Amino acid sequence: MSLALSYPHDPATGSPQPLPAEALWAVAAQLRAVVARDGSPWALSTHALVAAVAQLQVNGRRIASAWEFGQRVHDASGHEVLGVFETDPSTPGLALVSVNRQLIGDRPDLELSTVAHEVGHIVFDAPPSVTEPTRRYRSVTAGPNCLDGASARAERRANEFMGALLVPPRPLHLRLVARARSEGLPMVHAPHRGRPGSRVLPASTQPDALAGLTAALAGDFGVSDRFIAVRLRRYRLIAGDGR
């Protein structure tokens, strides 16, 4: 049975309406809830995530995905890239994803982030191919910097979805509070986007203490320290540091 996801969209084309971050987080939560866990209550795995999106219904449109991990992947200029997402007019409703394991190397965190980013494209950019069978779409993930610093709307959307899928606001806040308490670190009341009623780190948190917390949280969620740092900012879990 395929997972059904929904979000505001153009009913004629299937294209997403402009979605605020919180709406993207909500869609990510729908998907995360059904991804099987491989021994961790916090971290997702590449295998489980790919399996979860094999068949989807997105706003009533059936989307299948086919994944390739064994080949090198290049952009239109011939440069090697981390991943490519495509739809093809000959196979409407099928998302074609290639992930370059040779380029990723021994970085399971980078592979997971790349896969989650491409899942964002499946969820938001594949549905129009169902009702527009002549439409071809191609998105390239050139390198790690694309996973937290994109400019195009579709890439920013895929990145925000990826962030909330792998490291959601409330679970991250819960782990942050637990780890800060275990280290005896102070916390303060401040506006945030995480777990209601919980405190956040003060802006005065020492850099070495913050680095240690960030590394521990990265281990909890199976992502990089940089990934966690971005999510802490996005969820405003450090007082005065939200964007």
Predicted feature locations:
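Active-site hotspot residues in diverse enzymes, especially metal/ion-binding acidic/histidine motifs
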Residues: M1-R243
